[in-house]
Each structure stands twice: as C-alpha cells, then as structure tokens.
Amino acid sequence: RAQGLLQWVEVPFADVVTGKLARTTIAVSHRWFEKNHFDPEGQKIEKIQQVLRKEICDGVEFVWLDFLCLSQVWTDKGTFEKRSAEDEAFFQESLACMLPNLFLGARIMVLWDRDYNTKFWPNAEMYVSMQSPTAQGLLPSLNEHYRPVFACMLGFEGQDERIEKRMREDWQELHMDAAIAMLGQDDIKVTNKKDKEVNLEVLRQLPVNLQHY
C-alpha cells in the first residue's frame, strides 16, 4: 500500500454469481509458512508468478493475496505493528466478506502443501471455490464453471493433478452441512478461534442470502 501498488475494486454481487469476477480476478488460497510472514524465502511469490504465466490465467487483471491486500499486524520484515482503528475495522469486515464474495466468485489459486490440509481458512476457501452459487444454495461446480487452479508446493511439487483429484473427491460433492461439520472439527486448526466461529456462521447463512438475491 505504501508503494501505491494496491488497487481498490468494488465488486457487485452480480459479478460473483454470473462468473464475471472469475474472468478477471484470481485469489490465492494458502497457509502461511511462518506466524509472522507468509513467504519468508519468496517461494510462494515465485510459484504465483509461474502460475500467472500459464494459459489458464489468461484474462486475469487482479490478484488478491491476504498478506498484501489486508492490513496485517506483521510487516514485510516480520516485525509486529499494531493496526490503526481504521485498518482493524476494514480487516474484520473483510474476514466476513471473503468466503461469500471473493472465494465464491473469483478464480482461486490453491498453493497446496501437506499442512494446507490441516488449516481452517485454506480448506474453507477451497471448498467454497469448488461450489457454484444458485437459488438452491451452493452446488458442486460443473466443469465449465470450476474455478480452482492447483499449484502444489514443497514435497508435493509437480503433483498438481493427483492432489486436485484427491481434494475434489474429499470436498466438492459435500453438502454444505457436512462441509461445515468437517471444518468445525478440532483437527482443522485456526489461529483465531473467533474467525472459525464467525465464518462457519457465514457459510450457514449463504443459502439464505442466495435465495434473497
């Protein structure tokens, strides 16, 4: 933000449900490598650049990455810096909006590694990215509307197709209630327990909100 590189984009919910957002925007789903930095050695940035050069990302104009697009309490040097009141309010508002808007409508770059599978945010993001919004609630996406782009890392480098197949089998066909129950288990870890509680409720309300749209 200090460099003036962030761009504020207001996204109508119509762009989420019609697929327009997916044509221009990709969001990165990942787990942080360290508590105070998402990518201390630059491995993820390199992987993101590789994926963006692929044909599957043609048309992408905007990339959303939490560390860069949400005000963090950790600087890019890994030091703690308290958010301003304004930044804290925006951060909390964003947490409640990400799943039912960004991750429901954009293309999703899944930076998968072994620990990704144990984290609440990545798994919730991946589940939502495999669904399509309908008047009946969330339904598994047909192939032509499927939005995840898998890019495996670390010990799973080069195993994109195998891991994607496995994750689709585990998550894509799950009914919302079953997904919420799985995400609510204690072995799905989250740094802030309140984040899990708030966003499980966000998922519960999604079908109702879609009916009202």
What are these regions (language model features)?
Residues 1-213:
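The feature represents the membrane-entry module of six-transmembrane cation channels
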